[in-house]
Amino acid sequence: LHNLFNLRVGLVLNPIGAFNQNHDGPNYEFVDRPLSATTLIPGVFSNAGFGLYGKTKGTDWVLGYELYATNGFNDKIIDNTLERTALPEGVSGVENFSGKATYTGKLAIKNRLAGELGVSYLRGVYSAWEADEQKVAIFAVDYNGSFLHNRLNIRGELAKVSLDVPDTYIQTYGKTQMGAYVDVVGTIIERPILGWENAKINLALRLEYVDYNQDAFTETGGGIAEHVRAIVPGISFRPSDKTVFRVNYRFQEQTDFLGNLPSKSAAIQFGLSSYF
């Protein structure tokens, strides 16, 4: 078909956010995947389905879209051992638990100088019963840009989850969630190293935040405080674009449902990722 109209049928990576479709380890300077792209939006979120995709381009820009109807989620979203709303727990994959399609669409525009901005939306039904139909939706905005002759790269994503939760459920199962992350990577050395002609040494920084329950207590009206904050500086060595050795220091604060003083943790992480 035309570049604007291409058909895809089979197992589809739902185009919600950017990380879900671009999750390969060698693309990143960080050992862990972002929390918002793994604990809000399910990691490597794919389902059986079909849809259209396409793009058009001008001199300095590219405009693309994707639109799919797929399977979606089941009621494990609000019936799981985590005792909170968790979309990754309710991925249906090749099965359609609700009997209804989940629709996902994305529109992205890329400028040669300014970078790429994407907006995506998912909506579906996760309950199996017609009489008690429960809906779920995800809205996401993502950005990716390279500057200073590709020596500075900025990547980020924000996701907002909303869903119907029966009134009989306890308040740990929130109706709204939000998460975001920003990665900043700068190349400080780019020259031949130990026989690798295009080796790079990069400094990196990730800031991320996830709020698993943005609701308020019905008794007091006070906000529910189940959230995680993290800052992750790192350094990496790339002998080529397809291989990365990385060292991260992850500092994280996690606040519980009741808003008690946050628990703090810190870890040094080592990683190697490559295409073989």
Predicted regions and their residues:
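Outer membrane beta-barrel
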Residues: 1-75, 99-103, 108-116, 181-194, ...
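Extracellular/periplasm-exposed beta-strand and loop segments of Gram-negative cell-envelope proteins
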Residues: 22-24, 35-42, 79-82, 96, ...
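Outer-membrane beta-barrel pore domains
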Residues: 28-29, 40, 114-276
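General secondary-structure edge motif
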Residues: 32-33, 87-88, 227
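Short intrinsically disordered coil segments
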Residues: 67, 84, 220-221
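Loop-centered beta-sheet repeat module
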Residues: 75-129
